[in-house]
Structures are given as C-alpha cells and as structure tokens.
Amino acid sequence: MSALDAYKIRQDFAILDQVVNDEPLVYLDNAATTQKPQVVLDTLMAYYHEDNANVHRGVHTLAERATAAYEASREKLRQFINAKSTKEVLFTRGTTTGLNWVGRFAEQVLEPGDEVVISIMEHHSNIIPWQEACKKTGAKLVYAYLKDGQLDMEDLANKITEKTKFVSLAQVSNVLGCINPVKEIAKLAHQVGAYMVVDGAQSAPHMAIDVQDLDCDFFPLSGHKMLGPTGIGVLYGKEEILNQMNPIEFGGEMIDFVYEQEATWKELPWKFEAGTPNIAGAIALGAAVDYLSALGMENIHAYEQELVDYVLPKLQAIDGLTVYGPEDSSQHAGVIAFNIDGLHPHDVATALDYEGVAVRAGHHCAQPLINHLGISSAARASFYIYNTKEDCDKLVEAIFATKEFFNGTL
C-alpha cells in the first residue's frame, strides 16, 4: 500500500477537475510539464501582491522581504538535492539553460583531440551544447548506444577513455523511461579525470536526489517539471568548479566593482545571476519543493513505481502496440513511449485527446534516439503524483477505442 493518497493530492490541483471533449481530464503529459498545486499559485500571487520588489538591490522593507524569500528558496533547493552550500545552487531558466552553461564551461577547458561522451538517448538540450563546444574546440563528440532498451553499460565503459573530458547523461530518459546508474558512471568518469554531468530534468521531480552521493560535478533541473512555474530552474555545480567557470552573462548585480576598462565579479552564486532574476518563479519553486518534501521523495518514487507496475504489463499485452524502453517495469520510470502498428503517433494522441487523455506525440526533442529506434516519432504517456490506477485504466481503454476507430476507417 502506497504512502501517498493520490485522490487527496488531486484536491490541490483544480486544473485536473475539468472535462475535455466531454470526458474527465486524464493528464498524462507530466514529462513535458506538471500541473501546479494551489500553494504554488498562491505563493506566486502573494509575492506580486505583497512583496513585489527587486532582490539584492534595495534596503526598503519590500526589497528585503523579497530578497529573504528568494534566498530562502535557494536554501530549500540546496536541501532538496543535498548540495554542500547554497554557493553551489544557481538559479537558471531551466535544465536547458543549465546544460548550455556547462557547455560554455566546456569551451574553456576542451582542447583538440579531447572527447565528450554522451548517450544516444539524450534530449537535444544535452546534445547541441556539446556539438557546439566540440566544433569550437576541436574536440570529438562520442555516443554510447543501447542494449535491450537501456543504456549499454559495456559500450559506455569502453567509450570513456583517457581522452574523455566530460561525460553527460540523463539520469532518466524522457523517452525510454530507463533509469541510468549515474553514480556508477560518475566513478568511471572520475577515474579518467573527466567531469560528470547529470541531466536531472526527469529524475529530480520523481526520486530523492543526493548530488554528494552521486558525486556528479553538475546537475541541472527544471522547476516546471516538479510542480513549479515555468522559466525557473537550478544548476548545481561543485563549488571548486564553479569558481573556475567564467560568468555566462554580464550586467547588474553579478559584479563586485566596475572600472572603466574592466570589472570584477561577485562571489558564488551571484556571479552567474546577472540582471533581475525570475524572483516570483524562484520563490514559488521553493513552495513546490516544500510540497514535494512533505510528501517524501521516496514515497513519490514508490507510488509512481506502483503505477508503472500496474500499467506497463497492460500496455505490453495490447496486440500491435510497441512499448520502447526496458521490458521490466522495475527498471522503468513513469515515462512510457509507444506506437500502434499502422497509426501515426499524432493521430493516436489526437484520438486519445477525444477520450480526455492528454499524452504527447512527436520526437520528444530526442531525434537521434528516434532515428536510432528506426521510427519517425512516438506517443508518450507520463505519470506523476496525482495520477491514479483509474487514469491508467482510462489510458488502456482509450487506446482500445482508438484502435477500434481506426480499424473501422482503414
């Protein structure tokens, strides 16, 4: 029996209590973005209603309240991922921004002949920054491939060599749903003196994260995938590495002193936070972290595993339906990509929407993986704390209805 009560949790999400196409909404697009509990919405409005002021600039009461709330949120995020210090917690726009910042750091340190190792399952945000860094420095981008719907660890280990300077991998694939052993991989990277980057976009919302235990050098995450607002995220980096990194943007409040011909930078973390930040978003992300922490990340992970254990075998049993990723539900996170023989994924997603079921269809910002799988796109259902086994049943029923509809029209 799960420690989570999804029916009680749903009461905090008014958006879920609606009808779509004459059917109760079943929201299964959580890998794209999650819904927001009322406390997060209230926190956003409270900032604008009561404390709207810029941070780290004024000495008046509103500015000091806003600054205190902003920095309190940073501390909440530090605890959430177990960073050593708030100096290691940089506010960003999201995972994409964080990975781009790491890519800019790579441009500082890569040299011709160096190698960056990623996997074929990566999101474009964990591919293109490395492509650009390698183009600019003469380094080589190396891919590890798949075995049985998961990362081929033997292939990865063979690709990590003395030439490797960065290893960058998603902890959880946003298509395959597989959970990569990033702690083990970090050891392989560090054995050859490489930096380890863990894309936490699909893991931080769903499982307990301890960056010190993982021993990763960087860990970006997105707030909107973990009940927070859009446009806010975090890049974790080890303090000693962040001190080596050049600032990415320049301007207000990231400077210590500006002379006519040069300038000096503030200490961490502020040297990376130029200009007015997303103050409301950062504070509301802190409220989202409070909400998740109260539920317990271990409980969240266990509950989502219950849902996957329940629905994955049902999907695998449907004739003509292919599920991508690990066959064993115990190795599968709450992200399930699938195709139905003879049907385009966009048609499938549209038909499911007629049944009130919201899923995503497309290449999921992972075109190299999609090409590697030999398909053009896929439908994807993804689960979170407010989904229920009834939602799983509705997904399966809607897939059967979709198959029946198209079989009658083909």
Located regions from the model:
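Pyridoxal 5′-phosphate
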Residues: 1-410
